[in-house]
């Protein structure tokens, strides 16, 4: 410690050594200490007078009443501190905390959906199957199997383990309950995501040949492809919708909506993933760094298909960074505004062929939402390449409109984009 008692201060000259009586002393020529007793210089011996307060040289920093909205001021050396009422904050208590309650700021504190009001403030809302609680921000389920929840974890009060497919891990049975598998004549075609009891979303490029939808089967509740585990529900497909602007062989608008011939039954192992509101997806979910991708795709490039459902956490990548990376490789498709990138450049973890159409699921405040569809990439976990996903937020209106449309047409149908 310094001579002023502050740690880290610059040391002053050494203090004189104490003599036998604890008083300052001097060293004689023989080296022995000789006590010295004399009054302090410049002051007569006797009791010390009380120190006279020295007027502050910098003046009263609170004299100008800098604290607003009822804040109280405390003068400091060359500065001041405002103590604000509960509803205000800021250096001068200038900010009403209610003004910070806007959706762009931490989702307005809402657990699910947030709406700003023109007159100021915001209100929270909940997805279908949930209801807003008395606190005005929390959402509680109103149905046995609400979307975006994982019953096998909820019932054991667990938390979804952080999975890290190529370089991935097995998704434990029931922990990816919205995962669908699309098969043609029993062979794996693509992955998919359950959005509602009769609706599954996948990738348009899975249906490049007529055969792929004529003999198409969708299975929910699947985990191990080698075994019948009793949780599987198999359905035929009545119709497949793809965007009218999708061009076969191209990568833009790579999304397909499948209507099952009859609804599945929700169980602990079959639960839909929430299709989020567009603004919530673009403003809030897009800022979540890691999301989970799952599927039975090849474990290695041109390798064997996984027999158990795999899952992997991938970080979202800035679109500009992905576009720059893609331009370095001749022949790579253009990354458009209808796509986003995620993954690692070191080739360690990626979605792979056979995972096409599967979910890119994002968790926010305990509920999972569909944010992407596995679309394309350069090989599997190829170095210097990210995985590319269909940006679901661009198609939410299209999906909702189709899910609310009744049609007797069957087969592969082109549906106009809004």
Which residues are covered by each model-predicted region?
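Small-residue (G/S/T/A) turn/hinge positions that recur once per unit in extracellular repeat modules
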Residues: 70-72, 111-113, 192
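Extracellular mucin-like/proteoglycan-style low-complexity regions
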Residues: 1-56
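A conserved glycine-rich beta-strand in the N-terminal activation segment of trypsin-fold
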Residues: 184-197, 250
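Conserved H-D interstitial segment of serine endopeptidase catalytic domains
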Residues: 200-203, 208-245, 269, 273, ...
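Extracellular trypsin-like serine protease catalytic domains
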Residues: 58, 152, 156-166, 179-185, ...
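Disulfide-braced loops of extracellular cysteine-rich modules
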Residues: 61-69, 103-111, 327
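Serine endopeptidase catalytic core focused on the charge-relay Asp
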Residues: 248-272, 284-295
